[in-house]
Every structure is written in structure tokens, then in C-alpha cells.
Amino acid sequence: MKISRLPDRLDRMPMLKILVFFAAGIALADRYELPLWFLAGAFVVTGVLALSLRSSAATAAMILTAGFAAAQFRAPRATVPRGVHTVYEVTVEGFPADRGRYAVADASVAAWRDPADGRWHASDARIRLYADSLAGLHAGERIRCRGAVRPFRGGAESYRRLMARRGYAGTLWIAERTLLERLPGRHAGLHRRAVERLSRLPMSAGAAAVVEAMAAGERRGVTPELRTAYSRSGLSHLLAVSGLHTGIVFALVNLALWWLPLFRRGHLLKNLLAAVAVWLFVAAAGFPPSAVRAAAMCTVLQAALASASEYVGLNALAAAGFGMLVWNPSWLGDISFQLSFVAVAAILAWGVPLCRRCRTRWKGVNVVVDAYLIGFVATVATAPLVSHTFGVVPLAGLAVNPLAIALAGVVVFGGALWMLAPVG
């Protein structure tokens, strides 16, 4: 693309410009703090200037102020005391991972008791729950225990900031003697039922860990050795449900429903069923942020296909990203959000045009070339982020990504069919 055509292309992608200034406001709020009354006044003043003077600079300032205010207003706040030994009511989320002498699971704190006056206080904080082998943890159960929520220790400072952005207040260790009561558990959600269905398949422990991680986003069986092996080969992105997995389901569902447009209004039914299938897959995976972003973009694309309107991929991606940042501004600092967004943007901006330029007369060759080019572009685009965050650039992924994506398509789509099938 020529530089001279960049302003014209940006004019056709208004959501991309909005996203840039909104994200800049969120980034500034991470470093500075301003009174909300000041931000409200600045938003009104810049909005009036933008309307009266039709000033693009005032519009940009208004959007930046909105991002700053949203980040400051929606900043994660701990609703549990840290370092205070008291009683907590905790719900275990997902499936606990067995680490030998202890088990670990994500959990949410429903309430905690004030040790000073004995009063209970509601909470919505998330914690990383550790329990020794005698206590035992079960997916979805509610427990009442005694302990203290403590800040994350060890690891890099970036990891602690990441957990804070994701709403984690800290860690809580429990033992058999500090486990006071097991309460009636909540009903199994779609994610738990999906993982339970996958666990019925006759597979080895290693294969089950990979299938559960790729199809349902459940990483309980992923051992440190398996994670390291995938990371060194440049395939660690396959072990967490992300935009790649959602895109595989989107593409294969549309391919499987190719025959519906042969009937009257069949194209509308096809688009509706494809969108529903994508969101069901994301729900079965537990709504990971990168998959939600991809599902939102796929829905925009599906709606564009249904209405036969012009689809601009980057604009749709920007709209999905803007909506997610409005919902949760802290996702801007989430490395999984950053990687998936950069990868998809690079594929749309460079990968798709590159695939068109390398088109041949042989369809089989085109499929292989397209898979390699898409993997190459995504790997190169995300290499700076990966290098900065993890200190390694997995160049091996450039060679093995095409085959890995093809195999991932079989695992993800087959797993999705098994999880969501109404029988079995």
C-alpha cells in the first residue's frame, strides 16, 4: 500500500481512529490520575468544541478523555482485605489442576467476615486458590475456609500487574484444618459440562491435556514440561483458546453450511447459525478475552455477509476492540489481548493482500501457501511483543505453523462438535 493512499484508507476506517485515541487515554490513565470532575468537564468542553468548530483535534481530545475516564472509573479495586486472617466464602471456578502435593484453581470470593465485628461483606474479587492434597478441590464447589489473601509473590513484576488487570486480588492457601465447611455448589455451567464431555473421550493424559486446552480452554492438564515444549517450538498459542481457534470454527462452520443458500432465505439462516455456533464455542471455552474479541469480529463479518454490505476488516476489528475496552479498559494491558489483536490486524493488513499476490492456478498449493503466509505474518508481527514480554522469539514456529494450524483445525472443530452435540 502506498503511503499517499494511507489518509484515504483511514477515512474509510473511522473506528480505527477512535480506537487509537481511546487506547491512548487508557494508557495515560495507567500512569497518571486526575479527578473525575475534571475529566467530566474536559469531556464536555472538548465535545462542545468538536461540534461547534468541527475540529478533528477537539474530537480526538474528547475520545482520549473518554478513554482516560473509563480506565480510571473501571480500574480493578480489591474488595477483600489482604493480609488479614479471617473467614472467606469461596467458589471454585473451572477445574483444579493437580500439582502433586497441592492443587491450584481460579476462584471467586463471594463474601468475607470482618474479624473486628463479625459482619459479612460481599465481594466479587478473584483469587488464585491453593489447597493441599488432603483438603481437595472440586470444580464449581463452594467452600467456607479460614485464611488470608496475600499479594502475588515471585515472578516478574509484569506478571503481577497482569493478574491485577485481570481482577485477581491475590492468593489464598487452605489446608484440611482451615477448611470449615463445604456448601452446596452452583449448577454446572456450559464450560464445565463441555470439559466433562471431553474427559469421556478415550485418550492418554498428554493427548487429553492438549485437546482440553485447544477445544475448551481448560489448562488443568498442561504440565510445565508440555508448556515449555510448545513454547520453544513456537506453538504455545495453540494451548489457549484464542482468535485462531475462533476463526477456525467460524471458517469451518461456514464451509459446512455451504448448501443452505440453495434454499429460499437460506443465506440468512446460514449466517445466523454460523454466528450462534461461534458464540456457543466461545461460551464452552469460558469466554476468554481473545476469543470474545474474535467472536465479536466474526459476528460483524457475518452480519456484513448477510446484508451484502462492504466489509472492511480492520474497521470491524477496531470496532470489536473498542467495544471490549469500553467494557473492560484493563484488557489493554493484557498480553493475550495485545497478541491476538496485533496478529489479526497484521493478517488483515498484510497477510490477506500477500496471499492474493501469491495466488496460483492450483487450489491445493494455494491452501498450503496461504497457511504458511498467514502464520509467517502473524509470527513476525507479534515477535516484538513476544520478545519484550517473554524474552524469546520462537522462529521455529515459522516452519511448523502451517501443519500445526491444519491439525489444530481438526482438533478444535472435532472437539467443538463433541462438546456441543445434543446427544452422547
Predicted regions and their residues:
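Juxtamembrane/interfacial segments around transmembrane helices
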Residues: 51, 62-68, 82-88, 103-112, ...
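Membrane-interface helix/helix-cap signal primarily in integral membrane proteins
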Residues: 2-9, 60-237
